[in-house]
Amino acid sequence: MERALKMEKAFQKMSAQPQALPESKEPLALPVRLKGSAKEKRQLTHIINEMCKSDAGMSVIETALDNDYTFLFDKSIGATYGYADSGEEVCALNPNYPAADLITTIAHELRHVQQFETEIYEECDPYSANVKSNLMLTRAMEADAEAYGCLVSWELKEQGAPDAWNTFKADFPEVAKPFEKALSESGDVNEARTAAFMGWFDNLHRRDSYDAGYVETMSRIKADKTLKNYKPERFIEEICQAGGDAYFTQDYKIIGSDKCVSVSPDTKKALKEIFDRRAAEGKKPDASLNKLPVVAAPVEEKPAAKSQEAKAAAVEAKQESARAAIMQKRAQKDAASMIALRARAAKLSR
């Protein structure tokens, strides 16, 4: 909670008065469902139509259409840029951010919707899979989704709309620069997407942020007595899809390499404590945990300027999983339902 508040304050510091989002009176490029005022629908139409100028962008909007998603603005999600909730079939965006940011947010979040349709996503979860398998899944999904946002923003730049690319490149150079370099050298989009995917792993602070969510989950669930191990190749084969085939041009086993599954000292310590408690309950140890390499995120020798700290925190917020926003919404909905049920029960008992 303290960390989230820190990022929220940092974003507020670096944000000027938000500019009004562009509006479009043109018909939607694809007939997705919109929710909101007439003005909000025109703003959403602009964002979606811009997305559809990119082939990759249109692909994920088609996924949203096929899965009956509703697009809307959500002003209650703090510094979160947006989220796609597969349970509620909603793609929500924060209207306080520029359209360029929201375009790459949609690309990232709806790429997750495509990933949710894979067998490996259904099979591999914290309840039944070992630590290494869960790390490979989460990281493959996030690296692929970020590489997808990179692809969409690049395609829009090529169509004469550079704002999304300029914003993405400034915020995520470790993803954008390898993409740009590989495309320039090879002319192969698959090579570029692979380079962007691998670039995701160069930000160790982001790795630690996602790992914290996994540790929190493992600390509160009752996982199976024996945890399954999955081959690295499956994560690439199923998550890195492009038209029925994997776009990934490197050895698929790399997702299980030290570079891709390393954890921070704190993460390994926390997981070891969790699995020590499991052992005391008679559950089998997870051999994959002991083999995980430990690599600490670098520490700045000199404190960064306040403006740099604020930007770094805001970018980190952009990379945060939107699960917290989704869970908060569901908790509010559950609480409201419980109040209604209690009121009805009280009425019937009179």
Predicted segments, located by residue:
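Short pre-active-site segment immediately N-terminal to the catalytic Zn-binding motif
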Residues: 91-106
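Auxiliary, metal-adjacent structural segments of Zn-dependent hydrolase domains
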Residues: 22-89, 98-99, 288-302
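Extracytoplasmic/secreted proteins, especially bacterial periplasmic and envelope-associated proteins
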Residues: 43-46, 56, 101, 105, ...
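Active-site recognition of the HExxH zinc-binding catalytic motif
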Residues: 104-117
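Pan-zinc metallopeptidase signature
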Residues: 180-311, 315-322, 326, 334, ...
